[in-house]
Amino acid sequence: MSGIHKMSDKKLNILTLAFGIALLPPIWAVLSPYAGITTGAVALICAGLYVANGNKKEDALKITIGFLLGDLWAIIAIWVMETLQFNPNVELYLTLFILGGLAGLIGENIPKYIFTPAWLCGWAIGLTIMGPLSIDSLGTLPIQIGASMIAGVIYVGIGVDAFQKFIIKTIKK
């Protein structure tokens, strides 16, 4: 038996996962700016949530929907806070209270279609990137963020998992 075939399953999983993470996400990081996407790192955050949910391909769509709703929620929050004429802390609290409550109510009532943790995470991502900007200066940022979210779940999350399984299967032949 060669050395690679004697390796424990745990060690093989660790090494192939590390190789997949080292190989695939940097391709997105290098190529995404050529597509006009400046928010490529968002993909890693979104892939992390996908993996934390157990790499369940059957949940990929509802996780993606959750992220995209979070992106939309960030735009709505920015618009609401820009429109209100209260103390900024009151505006922030009320906006987070109402939109957070609505996200929880909506997402948890239709969990077949929406993964609420992804919605909240996507909202936080959107607010972190777009929060300091005015609604008029967002430009294509929401689209870039959404594209990075989709890439995170599909390309990085599902892609690295499939790549790892392929490598392990090939090695074990």
Regions found by a protein language model. Give the residues of each.
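Alpha-helical membrane segments and adjacent membrane-interface helices in multi-pass membrane proteins
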Residues: A41-I78
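Hydrophobic alpha-helical transmembrane segments in multi-pass integral membrane proteins
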Residues: I75-Q85, T128-P142
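Membrane-interface helix caps and helix-loop-helix hairpins in membrane proteins
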Residues: L31-Y34, K56-K57, M81-N87, I106-Y113, ...
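Structural signature of hydrophobic alpha-helical transmembrane segments
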Residues: A29-A43, M81-F97
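Alpha-helical transmembrane segments and their membrane-interface boundaries
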Residues: S2-N55, G139-P142, G146, V153-K173
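Transmembrane alpha-helical segments of multi-pass membrane transport proteins and ion-pumping complexes
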Residues: I21-P33, F67, D71-W79, L96-E108, ...
